[in-house]
């Protein structure tokens, strides 16, 4: 999911990119778009049977380098946190593999020090059934906003994608939430089912593209 505090960061919706097995962010109202550099990107892409999800344009870095035989960690060692001091927004990323194992990462500054880079990687080769892990950009509000700390948080996964997505969407701050994407993967067949929640309607978009039949779109 993505959140927004400024008008520019709230001016977004998730739009499916079926030819790449993922989604992109687009401006809900292009006339109000101020700076696209850190808010327009591909949050989700699929490389073969590997699913990549991040909070920035490092999605493409991971996709490109993994397609060349590099690893998730190799790709992220070429990147750093976002250049938006004094917050220096962390880059958070994850990959889910064909067998259901997954890896996560956060790239962040050292307590807001823009001259010091910290990279953390978390590997889950044998996930526990019914359990997931959560990592976010920030720990809580502040000035500057402190980055997430520690290991990813564990949570219990609901049995259906609908329960999971609806529960998560309803729990997000109603003023700041922008969009949510959820995906369920059949580990036997590799087939996927996706849901997209967008708080705002796009002024001009193809969100109802009939070719994107595997996507369920909801407004809230």
Model-derived features: positions:
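C-terminal, well-structured catalytic/ligand-binding subdomain of enzymes
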Residues: 47, 110-165
């Amino acid at each position: 999911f993505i959140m927004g505090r400024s008008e520019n960061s709230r001016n977004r919706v998730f739009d499916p990119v079926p030819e790449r097995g993922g989604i992109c962010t687009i401006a809900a109202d292009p006339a109000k778009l101020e700076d696209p550099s850190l808010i327009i990107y591909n949050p989700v892409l699929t490389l073969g049977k590997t699913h990549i999800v991040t909070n920035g344009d490092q999605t493409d870095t991971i996709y490109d380098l993994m397609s060349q035989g590099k690893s998730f960690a190799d790709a992220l060692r070429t990147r750093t946190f976002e250049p938006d001091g004094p917050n220096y927004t962390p880059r958070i990323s994850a990959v889910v593999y064909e067998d259901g194992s997954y890896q996560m990462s956060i790239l962040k500054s050292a307590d807001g020090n823009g001259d010091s880079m910290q990279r953390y990687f978390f590997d889950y080769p044998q996930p526990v059934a019914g359990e997931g892990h959560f990592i976010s950009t920030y720990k809580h509000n502040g000035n500057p906003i402190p980055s997430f700390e520690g290991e990813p948080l564990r949570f219990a996964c609901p049995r259906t994608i609908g329960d999971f997505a609806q529960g998560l969407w309803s729990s997000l701050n109603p003023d700041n939430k922008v969009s949510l994407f959820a995906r369920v993967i059949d580990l036997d067949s590799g087939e996927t089912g996706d849901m997209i929640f967008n708080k705002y309607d796009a002024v001009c978009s193809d969100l109802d593209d009939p070719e994107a039949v595997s996507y369920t779109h909801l407004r809230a």
